[in-house]
Amino acid sequence: MNVQRTFNRRTLLTGTVALGTVGLLAACGGSKDDKAGGKAATNAEDLVNNLQINKQDYSSLKKGGELKLSVSALGPDFNTMTQSGYTSSNLEAVGGCNIPATMGFYNLDPAGEDSMNKDFCLEYKVETKDGVQTAEYKINPKAVFNDGTPVDVEAVKAYWEIYKGGGDSGYSIIPNPFWGQIESIEAVDGDKFHVKITMATPYYLSEVIGTYAAHPALIDKELFNTGFVDKPLDKYWSGPYKVGNWNSSEKTLTLVPNDKWWGEKKPLLDRIVWRQMDPDSYRAGFKNGELDAITFVGAATYNTVKGQSGTDIRTGQRTNVDNLQFNATRVTDLALRRATFAATDREQLAKVIYSQIGWEEPMPGSMLAMPFQKGYEDNVPKNSGADAAKKILEEAGYTMSGEYYQKDGKTAGFAITTFGSDATTNAKFQNLEQQLKKAGIKVTNDNQPDANYNSVAGTKSYECLFNSWGVGANLADSAQYFYTKDINNGVGDDEIDKLVAKISETESKDEQIKLANQVEKLHMEKVAIYLPYANGPEYTAAKSKLANYGPSLFRTTYTNAEYWVNVGWQE
């Protein structure tokens, strides 16, 4: 599969993420059979020190120039705080234009460590006294939204207002439990840039909490939920780039330097042009010079772009987990979901995607962590195979009728939504279709255009799909973004919700990790919504003189505010 659908919930987390060990992509480059190659390993120091991004000093790069890039879908909702707007494509394209809401006041480095972004935050401290946890920080008084509204305590309160009510608040958000634990947010001694947050109960998952902000106008629910549909309203944003033009009919977004940007580093590029393209189009676009760089994971793209004059292929480890994902409000029978997971041969699915490029990796068993991260455990149920799946269905009252099981006159089955016409995507569906048929489960292919992904996934207009989520650097913190009833539209388990709540109340980091793994094991057995089957590599084909751009582990274009100001062209 050459286009990976990726969400990364890290931008909704509360702050610092713990340092995890990172993986080394070994034996990269051309092999004897001319595959992209690569193997997941565990040498953190070598990987972080040898990122393939054409690293260059900011001061040595050309001032000016244009960078032409593509994503699989732009919009239609450009508010990256909403369920439908929060997609990797939108974050990639506009996340760096809205730093306070997308990545907050801290930057994430390749190894997963946070550091203060002094363009927004000058001082920070958190402490717990007599059981009461407080955080205080000073916002850079130069920080403003593009319409001149200050980024101050009112902006932090606005973010709190939007998220504190969870999924029942009337805002179309991905719920974030942390914000509901805040008791108060106030200015210290009347200074609107000196913020104090008091927690109702201590929150121990992070040493940096509450360092996000939203334009106060976004408290208006209509503006928040629908105001950004086909309208990238950057007057409510703040960052080094702003929107120069949005061409809705051509699906082209042009970013230009923000004249209101106060940061020490100014953008190097005159323009970043984003275009919505499907795999065939972006492969051709790179080959004919219409694009300056493309990111991919599949053999078809590699075979198209390899050996092109004036370009190179930069290789890295994806910090993602590919998964089979149910919408449990549509596929409501737990037995059917559990049987599907039992019948799925995950190794075969991974081979469909990665064997053609010669990539090797251990089978992932978690949505919460990469196999090389501290605390990782394989939490996928071990009772698998067609016979195990049949037993689950029969114990739930299903009986075989012809080739498939039935219950109450309904065939055991569901639709899998796929996107585009990529050969690997089709092969993956066909592979899973045959696997499930052996267990008496019938699946159909709800194939849709690539451009529909954002709206379909964001509004959960599917029964099941092949998805991919970004992996956070803090295993324990990630559990709340996958395994609560609130995050899964009311589907879940009360015992699991209590365990998730206990994680943030537990001070010991080791105990947090143990609880998070316990949560994941229980959820896969008792709820069965996410089934991981691959992590995979990441390749970027780029023009050779493009600097500071390429696979960077946990440091992405939407987790590090310095990313885009450092991207430029060598003379």
Regions inferred by a protein language model and the residue ranges of each:
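Aromatic- and charge-enriched surface segment that lines or borders ligand/interaction sites
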Residues: 123-169, 194, 332
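Detector for C-terminal structural segments
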Residues: 18, 25, 344-375, 424-433, ...
